[in-house]
Amino acid sequence: MIGKHCILELCECNSVKLDDEAFIRTTIQMASKVAGAQLLNLITHKFVPQGVTGLALLAESHISIHTWPESGYAAVDVFTCGDQTMPDKACQLLVEELQSKRHSLKTLRRDTPVMISNALIN
């Protein structure tokens, strides 16, 4: 396995937190740490009149979050490579910190074409 790609839909979140760029930035830093990932770079952007996007470049891949405070919604991707990281823990932290009352998590296993072919043969 190359890694895990978690796709997280956060609904009914705290709209004030969703619109707070500093809070989103700190929360992404916390998520990368709890996942056991190494944060290389982090950029955020505050939109007018509302919304924040944050992108974290990890040594193991990335975390992205896009918020819509007016809808109480955030779209999150957490992709980590290798067996040592825990993207599901990052997702759980994001659910808790953004106070999501309802969420959906899909986890995809990422493999190389050779690994996929071998799995189909076996």
From Swiss-Prot:
Domain of life: Bacteria
Residue numbers annotated as active site: S61, H66, C81
Site feature: Cleavage (non-hydrolytic): E60, S61
GO biological process: spermidine biosynthetic process
Cofactor names: pyruvate
Enzyme Commission numbers on file: 4.1.1.50
GO molecular function annotation: adenosylmethionine decarboxylase activity
One CC-aspect GO term: cytosol
Catalytic activity: S-adenosyl-L-methionine + H(+) = S-adenosyl 3-(methylsulfanyl)propylamine + CO2
Co-factor note (free text): Binds 1 pyruvoyl group covalently per subunit.
Pathways involved: Amine and polyamine biosynthesis; S-adenosylmethioninamine biosynthesis; S-adenosylmethioninamine from S-adenosyl-L-methionine: step 1/1
Stated family: Belongs to the prokaryotic AdoMetDC family. Type 1 subfamily.
HAMAP family on file: AdoMetDC_1 (MF_00464)
Subunit structure: Heterotetramer of two alpha and two beta chains arranged as a dimer of alpha/beta heterodimers.
Family annotation (NCBIfam families): SAM_DCase_Bsu (TIGR03330)
The protein's role, per its UniProt record: Catalyzes the decarboxylation of S-adenosylmethionine to S-adenosylmethioninamine (dcAdoMet), the propylamine donor required for the synthesis of the polyamines spermine and spermidine from the diamine putrescine.
Descriptive protein name: S-adenosylmethionine decarboxylase proenzyme
Biological source species: Prochlorococcus marinus (strain MIT 9211)
